[in-house]
Design a protein with these regions (language model features):
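Active-site-flanking beta-strand signature of metal-NTP-handling nucleotidyl enzymes
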Residues: 2-9, 51-53
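Short, surface-exposed ligand-recognition loops at beta-strand->loop->(often short) alpha-helix junctions
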Residues: 9-20
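Short coil/turn motifs at secondary-structure junctions
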Residues: 11-13, 46, 57-59
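An amphipathic, aromatic/His-enriched active-site/gating alpha helix that lines ligand/cofactor pockets
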Residues: 24, 28-38, 54-88
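Short acidic/glycine-enriched loop/turn segments that link adjacent beta-strands
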Residues: 36, 45-48
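Short beta-strand micro-motifs enriched in acidic
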Residues: 42-44, 95
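Residues at the C-termini of beta-strands that transition into short coil/loop
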Residues: 45, 90-91
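Short, low-order "capping/linker" segments at domain edges
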Residues: 91-97
C-alpha cells in the first residue's frame, strides 16, 4: 500500500476550472469504480490551493492514469499553477473513521 499527497496552488483565474476538472475525475471514478484506490481531493480554505491524497493498494498500479479525465486534468496543470505541484509520500501514523 502506498499513500501520496499532491499539493499546489492555481491562479485565482484557474481555481474554478481546476475544481471542475477534479469533479470530472471523480465522475469517472464513480462510473468506472476501479479497485485498489482511495482518492480524496480538497480545496484548502477559500483560496486556490488544492490537495489530493491517493492511497493505492498496489504502488505500481495507479487506476487514475487510465482515466481520460485525469489525463486531461494533468496535461495542463502546471500552466494553471502559481505554486507547482509538490508530491509527498505519506506514512500512516493513525486513522479513525
Amino acid at each position: 500500500m502506498k499513500t501520496i499527497m499532491v499539493r499546489y496552488t492555481t491562479t485565482e483565474a484557474h481555481a474554478l476550472t481546476n475544481e471542475e476538472m477534479i469533479r470530472a475525475v471523480f465522475a469517472d471514478l464513480h462510473a468506472r469504480m476501479p479497485k485498489g484506490i482511495r482518492y480524496d481531493s480538497y480545496r484548502v480554505g477559500i483560496g486556490a490551493t488544492f490537495m489530493h491524497i491517493a492511497t493505492l493498494d498496489a504502488p505500481d498500479d495507479n487506476p487514475l492514469t487510465t482515466l481520460p479525465s485525469f489525463l486531461a486534468f494533468q496535461k495542463q496543470l502546471k500552466d494553471r499553477c502559481v505554486e507547482p505541484p509538490v508530491v509527498s509520500d505519506l506514512s500512516p501514523v493513525g486513522s479513525y473513521r
